[in-house]
UniProtKB/Swiss-Prot annotation:
Subcellular location: Cytoplasm
Record's function text: Catalyzes the condensation reaction of fatty acid synthesis by the addition to an acyl acceptor of two carbons from malonyl-ACP. Catalyzes the first condensation reaction which initiates fatty acid synthesis and may therefore play a role in governing the total rate of fatty acid production. Possesses both acetoacetyl-ACP synthase and acetyl transacylase activities. Its substrate specificity determines the biosynthesis of branched-chain and/or straight-chain of fatty acids.
The protein's name in its UniProt record: Beta-ketoacyl-[acyl-carrier-protein] synthase III
Domain notes: The last Arg residue of the ACP-binding site is essential for the weak association between ACP/AcpP and FabH.
Known EC number: 2.3.1.180
Family: Belongs to the thiolase-like superfamily. FabH family.
Keyword Isomerase: no
Active site: 114, 250, 280
Taxonomy of the source species: Bacteria, Pseudomonadati, Pseudomonadota, Alphaproteobacteria, Rhodobacterales
ACP-binding: annotated span: 251-255
Pfam families referenced in this protein's UniProt entry, alphabetically: ACP_syn_III, ACP_syn_III_C
InterPro entries (UniProt xref): ACP_syn_III_C, ACP_syn_III_N, FabH, Thiolase-like
Pathway recorded for this protein: Lipid metabolism; fatty acid biosynthesis
C-alpha cells in the first residue's frame, strides 16, 4: 500500500465588504471597463477593521473541519501560507491554533507570496508521507488591502482579502494515479527576479511598506513558468493534461489564466475561475477557488485536479491531486 495525503475537507471565508471596480473611479484615473479588460476583475472583498489574517484563516479552517467531520484536536499540524501575517511573530499559524482551541501538534507559516498555498500543500504532503502527521490543516490567508498604495492604479485595483483551507488526511492508496490524494508536486524559485514583485517595507526599513510590481514582466514569466510547472507535475503523476478534470490556477489575472490554459491545451470550461469575484487574493486564491469550485458542484470526488501558482521571488509551483 502507498500512503496518500487526501483532501477530506475544504472551506473558505470572505469579508463582508465587497468593493466594486466603480469605487476606484472616485479616487483614481481608472474605470470599470479598464480594470475588467486588463484583469478580468469585477469586485473584491476587503477585511473590516478588527478582521485579521489569522481570524479569516480560522474561519476558513472551521468550515473545512466541519466538512470533514473533524475537530481541531484531531489535527496534528497547521500550515498557513501568507505574506500578510498580523505580526512579525508569532506566526499566523500559531494564532490560528490558539483561536481553534488546538492544544497539541505544531503550527508554522510558509511565505512564498502568491505561490504560498502550493508550497504549503507540498510541505503538508511531505509531513504526512514521512509519518510526522496524519491530519494537516493547510490554509491560505491574506489581507493585501493593508499593503496597497492607494495612489497606484496599476496595483491597488487588483488585490483582495480572504482565506481558504483544506484538511489533508493520511489514507492508504494503491500507488497508482487512480488514488485519491496528492499525486505529485513541483516547486521552483529564482531570486534573480526578486525585484519584479515585492513589498518595499519590513524590519530593515521600519515600515510596513507597499506592494510594488512590474506587471508586464510578471506576465511574461507567468504563462511560461505556470505551464511548465504544471506539465512537470502531471508527468510526475503519470498523467497528462487531457486526463485533467479541473485546472484550479492562482487567480491573478484572467489573461494569465487563459494563456496558461491554452499552453496546456486545456479548454476554459475545465478551469475554475473566481478572479472576477475575489480579485488576486495571493496565497488564498487557490484554496478559495477549490472551496468555491466544490460548493458550485464543479469539483467532485474522484476528479483529477492540477493547481499552479506563481508569486514574488519569483516562486512558482504546481500540485496534482485526485479529489
Amino acid at each position: 500500500m502507498t500512503l496518500r495525503a487526501v483532501v477530506t475537507g475544504v472551506g473558505h471565508y470572505l469579508p463582508d465588504r465587497i468593493v466594486p471596480n466603480s469605487e476606484f473611479e472616485k479616487t483614481l484615473d481608472t474605470n470599470d471597463e479598464w480594470i475588467r479588460a486588463r484583469s478580468g476583475i469585477e469586485r473584491r472583498h476587503f477585511a473590516a477593521e478588527g478582521e485579521t489574517t489569522a481570524s479569516m484563516a480560522a474561519a476558513a479552517s472551521r468550515a473545512a473541519l466541519s466538512m470533514a467531520g473533524a475537530e481541531a484536536q484531531d489535527v496534528d499540524a497547521i500550515i498557513v501560507a501568507t505574506s500578510t501575517a498580523d505580526l512579525t511573530f508569532p506566526s499566523a499559524a500559531t494564532m490560528v491554533q490558539a483561536e481553534l482551541g488546538m492544544t497539541r501538534g505544531f503550527a508554522f507559516d510558509v511565505q512564498a507570496v502568491c505561490a504560498g498555498f502550493v508550497f504549503a500543500l507540498s510541505n503538508a504532503n511531505a509531513l504526512i508521507l514521512s509519518g510526522q502527521a496524519r491530519r494537516v490543516l493547510v490554509i491560505g490567508a491574506e489581507a493585501f488591502s493593508r499593503i496597497m498604495d492607494w495612489t497606484d492604479r496599476s496595483t491597488c485595483v487588483l488585490f483582495g482579502d480572504g482565506a481558504g483551507a483544506v484538511l489533508l488526511e493520511a489514507q492508504d492508496g494503491t500507488g497508482t494515479s487512480a488514488d485519491r490524494g496528492i499525486l505529485s508536486t513541483d516547486l521552483n524559485s529564482d531570486g534573480r527576479h526578486k525585484d519584479l514583485l515585492y513589498v518595499d517595507g519590513g524590519v530593515s526599513t521600519g515600515t510596513t511598506g507597499y506592494l510594488r510590481m512590474q506587471g508586464n514582466q510578471v506576465f511574461r514569466h507567468a504563462v511560461e513558468k505556470l505551464a511548465a510547472t504544471a506539465t512537470t507535475a502531471l508527468e510526475r503523476a503519470g498523467v497528462s493534461a487531457s486526463d485533467v478534470d479541473w485546472v484550479v490556477p492562482h487567480q491573478a489575472n484572467i489573461r494569465i489564466i487563459q494563456g496558461t490554459a491554452k499552453k496546456l491545451g486545456v479548454s476554459m470550461d475545465r478551469v475554475v475561475v473566481t478572479v472576477q469575484d475575489h480579485g488576486n487574493t495571493s496565497a488564498a486564491s487557490i484554496p478559495l477557488a477549490l472551496s468555491v469550485g466544490h460548493a458550485r458542484g464543479q469539483i467532485k470526488q474522484g476528479d483529477l485536479v492540477v493547481t499552479e501558482a506563481i508569486g514574488g521571488g519569483l516562486a512558482w509551483g504546481a500540485v496534482v491531486l485526485r479529489w
